[in-house]
């Protein structure tokens, strides 16, 4: 008798723990989704700017990703500096807004398109600039907060 009631108690505790975890996950998903909506709309609006190059260089995607890297650097440094920041706010800003705003898939697509067109040098320049400027932007964002 004692053994079976102990197991039943553990099962109840386990179910409660799972329900609490699921609730936290759903709330986190809502924060990421709301931020993603904002970031995606901002990304779309930036894409409407009349910025073009004669050679088809994807300058708008580069600008978008560098801005996003700079902002995520600010957020990461602010979260590290101020541990009182709400983790859900950090999730909303980093995974949500920055994740929705920046785009690796577009970067990869544009690089592949340039290579298909025989613009290997331009594609290589784009990859190098994206990596270097992205890392520098994160670093500058972090320095701004420190």
Where in this protein do the model-derived segments appear?
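Membrane-interface helix-loop junctions in multi-pass transporters/channels
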Residues: 2-146
């Amino acid at each position: 008798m004692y053994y079976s009631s102990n197991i039943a108690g553990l099962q109840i505790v386990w179910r409660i723990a799972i329900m609490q975890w699921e609730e936290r996950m759903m709330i986190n998903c809502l924060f990421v989704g709301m931020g993603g909506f904002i970031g995606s709309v901002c990304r779309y609006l930036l894409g409407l700017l009349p910025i073009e190059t004669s050679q088809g260089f994807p300058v708008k995607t580069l600008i978008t990703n560098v801005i996003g890297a700079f902002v995520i650097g600010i957020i990461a440094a602010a979260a590290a500096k101020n541990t009182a920041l709400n983790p859900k706010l950090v999730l909303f800003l980093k995974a949500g807004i920055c994740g929705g705003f920046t785009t690796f898939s577009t970067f990869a697509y544009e690089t592949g398109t340039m290579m298909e067109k025989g613009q290997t040098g331009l594609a290589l320049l784009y990859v190098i600039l994206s990596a270097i400027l992205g890392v520098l932007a994160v670093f500058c964002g972090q320095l701004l907060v420190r």
